[in-house]
Design a protein with these regions (language model features):
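Secondary-structure "cap/kink" motif recognition
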Residues: 1-323
Length: 323
């Protein structure tokens, strides 16, 4: 009889433990966000995007706009000083951003009330806002991205058209910035692909007895190597054009491709004591086959590009070297 009592007691204890566990997991399951398969940007519209705006409210100059013009993407940046920078953006980064946001992914609903916006940082004033637009400023979606959870590698967001806040895998955090240097095309002459002629002229007013203007073409020694070296060089920080208003003009580099498109870079130097800073201003002459959109992109550029002393010397050495 005693053995039977012991068995019954053990059975009751085991049943109680199983009951408690069932309550715990049932409650946990109810609190687990339900996932849906969707995308931040409707994939049907990804090929129609021609303008993107990013606003970062906690940055002084945290606003940047990208506009598709022909074969290029332009970035526009309004500075606190009232000046504007217009430069060529890195098309590969922008296309990657569009692709990422239009991928079907798991979205987890975490809230459906506006009172939770601030806690997830997805309000108009606390979140990073991204607008995807098409032609004629047609708005496809406006998204507010909130804070991220590094442990789960997720980020909170909501669409302007909905009160629902979701979280999803945070595999596009690098794109949520208004930093000009991140988005800009880093190469000094991205508009030229296959050069057929290169010329370089030094300002005679600054250099005593300089060499005459040097011109290289496809028949010149090591032309392919030299042109590839020039096209691989990259610039540094982008500044407003007024930065070089008081700078000394020192030289001009011109590079033309087979279509007749011509890129001209005017170089400037700013001397402050022992410190030297180098900049260039770029202008592009379109070819006869360039579209009106490409031409507009070329003529819209408004910026001064900083380069290192090493980069400037590399340009000179590359062009003037015998081999």
């Amino acid at each position: 009889m005693k053995n039977l009592d012991k068995i019954l007691i053990k059975f009751l204890i085991l049943s109680l433990i199983l009951f408690v566990f069932s309550l715990f997991f049932s409650k946990k399951g109810k609190n687990t966000p339900k996932a849906i398969d969707s995308a931040i940007l409707n994939p049907r519209h990804s090929s129609e995007i021609s303008q993107i705006e990013i606003n970062v409210p906690y940055q002084e100059d945290g606003s940047i706009i990208f506009k598709k013009q022909g074969d290029f993407w332009l970035l526009e940046k309004d500075l606190p000083s009232g000046e504007k920078i217009i430069s060529q953006a890195d098309s590969s980064i922008i296309e990657s951003f569009i692709k990422k946001t239009s991928e079907i992914r798991k979205l987890y609903k975490v809230s459906d009330t506006s009172s939770d916006y601030e806690s997830f940082s997805v309000s108009e004033n606390s979140g990073i806002t991204v607008l995807f637009l098409g032609n004629n400023n047609k708005l496809y979606t406006k998204v507010h991205f909130g804070h991220s959870d590094s442990l789960k590698n997720r980020i909170y967001f909501r669409s302007e058209a909905s009160k629902i806040t979701y979280e999803c895998e945070n595999d596009f955090q690098q794109y949520l910035t208004a930093e000009t240097n991140y988005w800009s095309e880093g190469k000094i002459i991205p508009e030229i692909k296959n050069p057929v002629q290169i010329s370089f002229k030094i300002n005679e007013g600054l250099v005593g007895q300089p060499p005459k203007a040097t011109t290289l073409d496809e028949n010149s020694s090591s032309f392919s190597t030299k042109s590839n070296t020039l096209l691989s060089l990259r610039h540094g920080k982008i500044w407003p054009e007024t930065t070089i208003n008081s700078a000394d003009y020192i030289s001009t580099l011109s590079v033309q491709d087979g279509s007749g498109r011509l890129a001209k870079l005017d170089f400037f130097k700013i001397q402050k004591g022992d410190d030297e800073s180098y900049f260039y201003r770029k202008s592009i002459q379109p070819s006869p086959v360039d579209s009106q959109e490409n031409t507009f992109a070329f003529y819209s550029e408004k910026a001064a590009y900083e380069i290192s002393a090493w980069t400037y010397e590399k340009i000179i050495q590359t062009i003037l070297s015998a081999e």
